[in-house]
């Protein structure tokens, strides 16, 4: 497929050379000419794709569930804390509760379930669950600063993505429980694991459902099937709400600390968007320690890396039909082994994948999930030891851990890399009990014809709104300061340049040859801000407007799974408004 795509691109580039050759100047450098030809070719591909899919859109009627923008009613939405406190109250105290549950259905061996992440020729275009390797989990924390401004709930689900419509279903069930506390926010994020049961709908019996819903589009009285399995989603809603209830009931007072460290950037692989030049190689952790020592502390980990290794179909054994939580499961397993509860938030992960080289160590593995185990364990060891010296790290090791290192050094030889070699500890700071959250909606214009078609065919649980001939989706963005630590809530897979700046925001580095005009998260809130990605929605990829093209080839495949060319600026302008509000 890739070879065919490259041949097509080559033909298009030759055509664009013939068409545009007369406009080239003799003074243009070879690099400039190459860039011009490449962009011209990409533009032609984008035009062809948009025209073909746009034509299909034209003949497929809108879903009867689409509504006018002015008729939209906002429900099950939380704006955050009522006030923005600059400092902690005199008598304030952190309280945190934790709970987790499995989302593996009991009937998985007798009913067809589909993994969200890959439908690929290498798995025969079949992604039904055949084996459970470890687990698919939901993890929840309930957090309060004791200021009577409500409790914040955070859930993290092992899945490819969780749409805002489904998140509101969870909120509705939590609200119905009447747990005796006020919530300032109920937040749900996805790990973006590519080897757990599909919760979005794009991977569940896709092709039969696609054609069935296409036919039903022309018969008004027939209901389209939803993308994700309806019974399974009901199970997820109920399990999520019940787990949130348990987290609230588990709340107890304690202290909260924070540490962050830049780790080797080889642990993070920018695989398919080379013009986005930033790599966020920070590992951040929060640790909640209860006052009552009879209860476990809770560790919250934040890094930015796609969990897509275990689910990629490559052969008959690793065939993309095995359920696993990828590296995040093993990250949690190791941290729990050391006596902590575990919570996770992924970061800005567009184009950023697990860099398995340093964790691989030249040690042979038989299955791809074993590679994620090694990666997860290594990240966990770093998280557990951010504030420890090399001497402390070695003193805290068990005999079994020391023996394992010695054994693997022998196997890996010169390819073995000790994760803590040259390790420098960082300082952990105690966080004042002051929690501020501000969440707002942004109205994103949908320009991607493929996403319009997905909406018309009812495959994903979005509320699509119309204004004239244009389509819109409302998404949630948010900003939190937790004891002074700044956190941006991003509703999808965000290009890291939008967080900290980078090549794709510049005129020279972008497809359009123009600079991105909005400020980055670092510019708005400071370079110490971190990102919780896929939070309160899963909008697909969010790329800078100036580097957006529907060419699908090369470094622009992310645009195929994005709302459109204005998602980046709409979201960043929303954050600019938040920055103004909290001044």
Predicted regions, residues:
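Conserved beta-alpha junction segments in alpha/beta enzyme cores
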Residues: 31-189, 193-374, 387, 394-583
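Hydrophobic core
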Residues: 13, 17-18
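Sec-dependent signal peptide cleavage junction
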Residues: 19-32
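Glycan-recognition surfaces in beta-rich domains, encompassing non-catalytic CBMs
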Residues: 383
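Bacterial N-terminal signal peptides that target proteins for export
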Residues: 1-12
């Amino acid at each position: 497929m890739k070879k065919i795509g490259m041949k097509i691109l080559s033909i298009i580039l030759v055509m664009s050379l013939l068409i545009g050759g007369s406009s080239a100047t003799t003074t243009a450098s070879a690099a400039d000419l190459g860039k011009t030809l490449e962009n011209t070719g990409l533009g032609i591909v984008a035009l062809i794709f948009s025209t073909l899919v746009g034509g299909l859109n034209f003949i497929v009627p809108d879903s009867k569930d689409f509504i006018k923008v002015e008729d939209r009613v906002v429900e099950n939405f939380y704006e955050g804390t009522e006030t923005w406190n600059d400092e902690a109250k005199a008598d304030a105290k952190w309280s945190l509760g934790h709970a987790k549950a499995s989302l593996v259905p009991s009937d998985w061996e007798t009913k067809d379930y589909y993994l969200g992440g890959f439908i690929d020729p290498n798995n025969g275009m079949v992604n039904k669950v055949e084996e459970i390797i470890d687990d698919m989990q939901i993890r929840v924390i309930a957090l309060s600063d004791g200021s009577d401004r409500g409790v914040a709930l955070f859930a993290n689900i092992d899945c490819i993505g969780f749409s805002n419509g489904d998140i509101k279903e969870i909120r509705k069930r939590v609200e119905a429980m009447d747990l005796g506390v006020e919530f300032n926010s109920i937040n749900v994020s996805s790990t973006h694991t590519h080897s757990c049961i599909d919760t979005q709908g794009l991977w569940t019996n896709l092709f039969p459902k696609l054609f069935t819903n296409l036919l039903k589009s022309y018969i008004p009285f027939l209901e389209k099937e939803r993308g994700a399995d309806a019974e399974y989603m009901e199970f997820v809603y109920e399990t999520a709400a019940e787990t949130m209830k348990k987290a609230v009931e588990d709340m107890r007072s304690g202290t909260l600390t924070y540490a962050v460290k830049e780790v080797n950037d080889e642990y993070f692989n920018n695989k398919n968007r080379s013009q986005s030049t930033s790599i966020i190689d920070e590992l951040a952790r929060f640790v909640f320690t209860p006052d009552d020592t009879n209860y476990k502390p809770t560790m919250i980990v934040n890094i930015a890396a796609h969990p897509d290794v275990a689910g990629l179909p490559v052969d008959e054994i690793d065939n993309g039909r095995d359920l696993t939580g990828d590296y995040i499961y093993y990250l949690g397993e190791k941290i729990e082994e050391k006596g902590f509860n575990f919570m996770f938030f992924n970061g800005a992960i567009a184009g950023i994948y697990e860099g398995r080289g340093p964790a691989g160590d030249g040690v042979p593995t038989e299955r791809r999930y074993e590679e994620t185990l090694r990666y997860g364990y290594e990240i966990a060891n770093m998280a557990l030891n951010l504030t420890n010296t090399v001497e402390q790290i070695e003193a805290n090791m068990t005999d079994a851990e020391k023996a394992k290192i010695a054994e693997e050094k022998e196997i890996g030889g010169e390819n073995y890399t000790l994760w803590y070699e040259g390790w420098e500890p960082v300082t952990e700071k105690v966080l004042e009990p002051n929690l501020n959250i501000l969440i707002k909606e942004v109205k994103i214009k949908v320009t991607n014809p493929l996403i319009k078609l997905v909406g018309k065919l009812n495959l994903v649980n979005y509320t699509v709104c119309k204004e004239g001939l244009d389509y819109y989706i409302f998404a949630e963005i948010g900003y939190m300061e937790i004891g002074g630590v700044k956190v941006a809530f991003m509703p999808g897979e965000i290009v890291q340049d939008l967080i900290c700046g980078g090549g794709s925001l510049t005129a020279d580095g972008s497809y359009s040859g123009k600079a991105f005009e909005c400020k980055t998260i670092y510019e708005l809130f400071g370079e110490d801000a971190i990102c919780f990605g896929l939070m309160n929605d899963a909008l697909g990829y969010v790329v800078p407007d100036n580097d957006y093209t529907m060419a699908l080839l090369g470094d622009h495949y992310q645009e195929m799974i994005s709302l459109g060319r204005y998602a980046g600026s709409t979201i960043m302008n929303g954050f600019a408004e938040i920055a103004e509000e909290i001044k």
